[in-house]
A protein has these predicted regions:
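Short glycine-rich anion-binding loops that position phosphate/pyrophosphate groups of nucleotides
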Residues: 52-54, 133-136, 198-199
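C-terminal functional extensions of proteins
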Residues: 199-315
Length: 315
């Protein structure tokens, strides 16, 4: 197995760990979490997208914990934070938020061709974040790592990121354009962040040329949806945690959660109906890795910048 190239930042070294063998070495982005954290300082309104439904009625445990932890950190920094996903993926997300004592400010992503424009016009986020959310591949389908379509269960939330990307390329972002639905007018494109671990998630369009060099399956399933800042990690939740650790460095505040909270997050997601995205079993694991493994990673992230040494472990 190849080893990802990382710099001297211990947070990058932790995010580059790949114990589940996802094969991220070829497209890992050193400094990605730090760049995303810097982009999030001063965020006003944040919309977080998560939830990967691997089969009918089976949302996975990777995604909601990362969304809850990152959302809490941003809310503590003064941002307004909301979350959206498919209706079937909302219970694990709500469970994760409750496990941290956070407001469950979530809504089901609507149906319809103009849904993306309508949501962006209504929410007007300054920052749009995707954590472990499928992004369309070159054929327009949504594929899992085995090359099987999951489009039936996952609505096209990535359209918001594509729409934001197109809007940001315009010279005058707020200017109306003929032929666009009324709901698309009058909003400014948010800065976009994507977090993933497999190549088929929102944001991986930013490294599509690298993914094309991987196996034929990876090249086929790779997402074409780009973002302004991409964070790659061995587990997508870890990518979100890495951003929070970097935010802690920037602010000097204890924003990262604790290992004990990590255990509660995974348990809450499982009890709300989430399954391991790889085994599809309803058990307290994420990408085949035990809850204790994830808690250990959180402990190391905290130690990587002295967080736990400053405040001690909380239960």
């Amino acid at each position: 197995m190849r080893t990802a190239r990382v710099g001297s930042d211990p947070i990058d070294h932790l995010l580059a760990l790949d114990p589940a063998g996802r094969g991220i070495a070829g497209f890992f982005r050193p400094g990605g979490a730090q760049a995303a954290a810097r982009a999030l300082t001063g965020a006003g309104s944040v919309l977080i997208v998560t939830g990967f439904i691997v089969a009918e009625g089976m949302p996975e445990t990777d995604g909601p914990p990362g969304a809850a932890v990152l959302g809490r950190a941003l809310r503590r920094m003064g941002a307004r934070v909301r979350y959206t996903s498919d209706a079937a993926a909302l219970p694990p997300l709500e469970g994760a938020l409750r496990a941290l004592g956070e407001p469950t400010d979530v809504f089901a992503y609507p149906e319809g061709a103009d849904a993306a424009a309508e949501v962006l016009a209504r929410e007007r986020p300054t920052h749009l974040i995707a954590i472990e959310r499928p992004g369309r591949c070159r054929s327009g389908d949504y594929l899992n790592m085995r090359g099987i379509s999951v489009a039936e269960w996952n609505r096209p939330l990535d359209e918001m990121f594509l729409l934001a990307h197109r809007r940001r390329k315009q010279r005058s972002p707020a200017a109306p354009r003929t032929g666009h639905p009324r709901s698309e007018l009058g909003w400014r494109a948010p800065l976009t962040i994507g977090i993933g671990d497999g190549g088929n998630e929102i944001g991986m369009g930013s490294v599509r040329t690298l993914l094309a060099r991987e196996s034929r399956m990876v090249a086929r399933t790779a997402s074409v949806v780009p973002v302004d800042h991409l964070v790659v990690a061995g587990v997508s939740n870890w990518g979100a945690y890495g951003i929070v650790a970097q935010l802690g460095r920037i602010t000097g505040e204890p924003l990262l959660h604790t290992p004990a909270e990590e255990l509660r997050l995974i348990d809450a997601c499982m009890k709300a109906g989430a399954v391991d995205g790889i085994t599809r079993r309803r058990e307290p694991t994420v990408d085949t890795l035990s809850a204790d493994t994830h808690a250990a990673l959180v402990a190391l992230l905290g130690l990587s910048w002295g967080d736990f040494s400053r405040r001690g472990e909380r239960s």
